[in-house]
């Protein structure tokens, strides 16, 4: 446990650039791996099952988003709390948070599965399924939902591994899952001819294997955080605080879920089932870059949180700047790929000409303001890591509800399906402006605080 304490102190003393690399690189590798994981499923399904199966898979995105929303409600909230508690040297509470995460994920994971499985067909039709695509969507989702409690537990424990100073172990768990999934996918789809169900079975099996390994890590008595009797009973304050902090990513995912439903329904209306598949492909490509930025954000979180708690505002300032530079480099790369070679990127997923055309056109539009979106994502995450959940929620919801939703509804009235594609970059632009204003105001506050502290010390 002593080495863990020392590990936490390095967050307040070591050079920021070195720390950010040390914390962000494992998270970036893990996030890239998990978005590749989604891509691999799409690629094998696209080539091994067919273009309509890609549309069927894309229809399940909102439901997967919804499941992820409940996962992040617990995972993000608890890991932020653990970071703060370890910073305050309150190890007993940190232990209890770990136990409560296991209990909460169990309850939410099973509850979610039961409710969604009972009404699966109506949900999928509401999400934009058609008689041609429903069977693909249903086959995939039934298996994913049966394994939902495993997914929740796996994501929740991974967030805690990172927060308790083991970013490498969290990365290992994610990469293991991806590798196993990538090996099992072609075996189940091509060899056993299980179709889209094979992809779902591969996903859940891979998570089970990683989960077993995570439990092994957390049962080690020498760990600062370890599973033991008496920590599983839900405690009001822990549950309340976890949910309060996790509310921001939860609402973000919830909003994203509804956005995707509107996009899918709109595209289907103008361009038919294939257009939903096109959005699915564009989503996967864009997601790769977004996930890398999220990895950077995860690396920033413990550093910003700890130094904010220790009132070292100059270090908070430094880590934020570095993270924004990194994020902008990543999203600019995404912009170049989408503008210069969209057909190439898209053809990884399908050989179907019509689907390639629809997807490439969409990709070109979606990444047009991509260079500035990194800044907006970092800012929203920054407010979350220093415990200003309200501001983080406001930022993420302005993009989704204030800008994106109205655009998706109004723009197609003039421009048809192009309006739906254009609504995405337009709302990115607007949200970045809002983020810039909020960040500027926050730093004015830090400056006055920082000067006050210098005088006092």
For the regions a language model picked out, list residue spans one by one:
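Short alpha-helical transmembrane segments in multi-pass integral membrane proteins
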Residues: 3-24, 82-149, 193-246, 304-369, ...
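N-terminal transmembrane alpha-helices
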Residues: 11-48, 62-77, 81, 106-113, ...
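Transmembrane helical elements of multi-pass membrane transporters/channels
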Residues: 22-41, 143, 177, 206-210, ...
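Helix-terminus/linker motif at the lipid-water interface of multi-pass membrane proteins
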Residues: 36-55, 124-131, 187-194, 257-284, ...
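Small-residue-rich hydrophobic transmembrane alpha-helices
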Residues: 54-114, 151-170, 278-336, 340-342, ...
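Hydrophobic transmembrane alpha-helices of multi-pass small-molecule transporters
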Residues: 66-69, 181-186, 211-215, 287-291, ...
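Short runs within selected transmembrane alpha-helices of multi-pass transporters and secretion channels
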Residues: 75, 144-162, 173-181, 199-212, ...
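Structural signal for membrane-spanning alpha-helices in multi-pass inner-membrane proteins
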Residues: 116, 159, 185, 189, ...
